[in-house]
Amino acid sequence: MKPVIKNIDSFSNPILGTKDGVPTVVSLYHDHAPGESSKHHSHPWEHQVYITSGSGIVWVDGEEFSIKQGDFILVPPNSTHHFKNTGDGMLSRITFNPKESEEYL
């Protein structure tokens, strides 16, 4: 396997995945404008989320957690969850999923 380098300003989701030769992890990038939320959903895999900028709230199985730039979040498998930007600037995050998630994208 060879290294793959992509710039955040010129990519499409997934950032990195099996099409790039990555065998186990799919990386996705999401931006949320102030007041915007992601879709409330669940899936059978856990995933990790890194907040690259902004602040907001993540709901996981009905429980609310404040999030901000620099936070790393583990969302358990089969949990219902969504993110909401409660700040004044953009809420940006990178999500790391197992490769099985790619078929749902």
Question: Where are the predicted features?
Answer:
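Structural motif
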Residues: Q48, S55-I57, E64, T80, ...
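A short, N-terminal "cap"/entry segment at the start of jelly-roll beta-barrel domains
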Residues: M1-V25
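Short, conserved beta-strand element in jelly-roll/cupin
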Residues: D31-H32, H43-V58
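Short acidic-glycine-tyrosine-enriched beta hairpin
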Residues: G62-P77
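Ligand-binding loop in jelly-roll beta-barrel domains
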Residues: P77-E103
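Conserved short histidine dyad/triad with adjacent acidic residue
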Residues: S27-H43, P77
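Short histidine-centered beta-strand/loop micro-motifs
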Residues: L16-K19, S37-H43, K84-T86, L105
